[in-house]
Amino acid sequence: MLPFAMTANRPAGESSTYIYRSAEKLSLFLPCARQRFWPGRNLIAGPYAGEFGYELMQWQGFVRARRRHYQAVHVVTYPGREYLYEGCQVHYHAIDLKKAGYGYGLLDPRRTRELADAKAAEIGLRDYDVFDASLLCTRYHKALFWRQDFRLFEEPPLAARPCDVVFHFRAVDKVGSDHFKNYPPALADELVQRCLDRGLSLACIGHPAYSYCPANCVDWRSEDLRRTVAAISTGRTVAGENSGPMHLANLCGKPTILWAQDQWRIDYSLRWNPFRVPIYTAANDSCQPAPEKVLNVIVASLQELAARTENFTRRCYTLPAQPIANA
């Protein structure tokens, strides 16, 4: 990774995210130091308006680590994300996820500060710091000033009997070049039917507006992250295109079966894996792999996991969480 890269190395023209100028990066060392060593009484974290995967594997870990230094922490993020911020007061913004960009998003530092100050005025907050994505703009800022604190997400399962595979079929029309990451419904239907023919028990997760569930699959999609974590907790594996819900599964300690059109995308999950759960690759050259190919990897992965965990009676993650801020 380049020393001052804000996000990983996407191909040229693909990174729809705010790009920091060199002068901006240098100027941000001072506010990082002030907030790190002389924090105010309260903290506004956000507004966060980036990708769900970045919120899971980067942002919320930093916010949790800062929480102990403040009397109160107010997080401004997308609706439905309260579960990620225990001990914080969560507020929603109205930024359209489909137009927010990639990585940490398109908001520039000035606009981010305006929105944070407006929220502070709205709730009558004084003596506050603003922790936003600009303070994480390079690996040096993260390494010098910030730490992450991850917790293992666990909830009681939704069913008494474990589900072999929990799918996430991405289906969001997002502005930018990643629209091709969606798995076509026809392929999802075929994959689910092939799995059922092999005797596998299945379910689907995801936001109802941004994911697809075949008609013959148990529908556990929800806007409530707590319920989604409960659904993941019911599964033995989670399978899907390499996107936010796959990162969520890793934070739940669940093995994942991924596909993506580039290996560098798979590498994200291999590095962003604080609990070191097993990760299997169904395809690293396509977001739309053939259902038969995915099925073969699913079957092989379940067999390997059964042997590794004494027929799923032992956990397959490690504690404590490993640092991944600059991974």
Show where each model-derived region lies:
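Membrane-proximal basic amphipathic "stem/tether" segments
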Residues: 1-37, 316-327
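Short, polar loop motifs at secondary-structure junctions
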Residues: 77-83, 205-211, 243-244, 262-264
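Short loop/helix-cap segments at secondary-structure boundaries that form the rim of catalytic
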Residues: 82-89, 208-217, 248-250, 267-273
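A nucleotide-sugar donor-handling region in carbohydrate enzymes
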Residues: 104-166
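Nucleotide-sugar donor-binding patch of glycosyltransferase catalytic domains
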Residues: 247-327
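Active-site and donor-binding regions of nucleotide-sugar-utilizing enzymes
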Residues: 24-123, 227-230, 245-248
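Catalytic donor nucleotide-activated moiety binding site of glycosyltransferases and closely related
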Residues: 78, 162-175, 181-228
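Acidic donor-binding loop of glycosyltransferase active sites
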Residues: 233-239
